[in-house]
């Protein structure tokens, strides 16, 4: 099972992401966090395989959260997400979190695996 950490300050997105992860074959929800700080601490304790991190959060934002997660564990795949409507932000390699689904989650993982293959 691929263990997933979701970090987002939106309660409604955390609920939706929880449903998607639970419904996705081969994935399990390891933890959810409402702040970047909480996400970093949970990642340290739980060592997830995949972290879905919102870009825009109060406190430490998604980029800083991702940097701290990467410093803690080189084994966690980190995906930055946004719901920003402007295409320039989405085209920067950010996942449009409005499109999160079991199929999208599987594709994210498959791309991460291909990128890590030598």
Each language-model region and where it sits:
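Active-site residues of response regulator receiver
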Residues: 8, 54
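Two-component/phosphorelay signaling modules centered on CheY-like receiver
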Residues: 11-31
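Acidic, metal-coordinating helix/loop segments flanking the phosphotransfer/catalytic sites
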Residues: 32-50
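Acidic catalytic/metal-coordinating carboxylates
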Residues: 35-38, 61-65
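Conserved phosphotransfer cores of two-component systems
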Residues: 44-46, 68-75, 85
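Receiver (REC) domain active-site loop signature in two-component systems and cognate sites
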Residues: 57
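Hydrophobic/aromatic residues positioned on beta-strands within the core alpha/beta folds
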Residues: 81-82
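Output/docking surface of receiver
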Residues: 91-115
């Amino acid at each position: 099972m691929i263990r997933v950490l979701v970090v987002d300050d939106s309660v409604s997105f955390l609920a939706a992401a929880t449903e998607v992860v639970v419904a996705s074959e081969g994935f399990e929800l390891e933890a959810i966090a409402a702040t970047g700080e909480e996400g970093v601490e949970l990642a340290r304790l739980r060592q997830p395989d995949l972290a879905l991190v919102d870009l825009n959060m109060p406190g430490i934002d998604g980029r800083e959260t991702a940097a701290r997660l990467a410093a803690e564990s080189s084994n966690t795949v980190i995906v930055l997400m946004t719901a920003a409507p402007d295409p320039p932000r989405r085209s920067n390699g950010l996942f449009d979190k409005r499109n999160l689904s079991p199929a999208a989650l599987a594709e994210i993982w498959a791309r991460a695996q291909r990128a890590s293959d030598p």
